[in-house]
Structure formats: structure tokens, C-alpha cells
Amino acid sequence: MRHGNGLRKLNRTSSHRLAMFRNMAVSLITHEAIKTTLPKAKELRRVIEPLITLGKEPTLANKRLAFARLRDRDAVVKLFAEIGPRYANRNGGYTRVLKMGFRQGDNAPMAFMELVDRPEVDASEADSDAE
């Protein structure tokens, strides 16, 4: 009897899962949008939402907790300097998961995960950044 039905194992060991979600959380904080499989995106919400809630109150203890979970200094700085203040008046629901169809090779359901209320990027700015 599986009381609670905790988390998706995603066919990985616990250390691999921890490292994968740590890397995905850093990527989401850095780029504010990522493309991944649907089960990973749904499980990543459980990792990233509490981190953004920590980022709303920039105490030293919260910064240390965030660094312990992310292990990336630049991501922690961005979390507390940009992302936390952006969601100061929002109580949860910081991410959006959009279904993107199925991957060509193995037909895995894909998803686009992004932070809500992220700044829009104009096409002209994107072209100048690419050059």
C-alpha cells in the first residue's frame, strides 16, 4: 500500500534525480523558460516553487537555503535580485507548463515550462543578442 504516493522516480536513482532537478531549476532561473518532458516539468514545479518563495524574502538564511538546494551562485543572485521581487505580491503559481506535443524519436510528451509574468523579448532584441 503506497500511502501518499510521494514523487515520480523517472527511472533514476535518488542522486541522479537530485542532480537533474538541481540542473533544471538552475536552467529555469537563468533562462526563465525551458523545454523538457511533461513528467519532468510537472515534478520540477515541486522544486522551483518553494525556491521562488524563498527568494521573496532576502534574508541570509534564505540565501543559504537556496544555495544549498541550487549550488549555483549566479542563479541564487538572480533569484533574490530579480525573480523574488517580481513575485512579491503573488502567492504561489509562479510557473506555467504548456504541452508541446510529442518528441520525434521516442514519442515522449514534451512541455514548455516558463515563469509567469516574465518580461517579453522583442524579435529585434533577440536578433541582436544572437549576433
Curated annotation (Swiss-Prot):
Keyword list, A-Z: Ribonucleoprotein, Ribosomal protein
Gene that encodes it: rplQ
GO CC annotation: cytosolic large ribosomal subunit
GO biological process: translation
UniProt cross-references to InterPro entries, sorted A to Z: Ribosomal_bL17, Ribosomal_bL17_CS, Ribosomal_bL17_sf
Family membership noted in the UniProt record: Belongs to the bacterial ribosomal protein bL17 family.
GO molecular-function terms, A-Z: structural constituent of ribosome
N-terminal signal peptide: none
Protein name as annotated: Large ribosomal subunit protein bL17
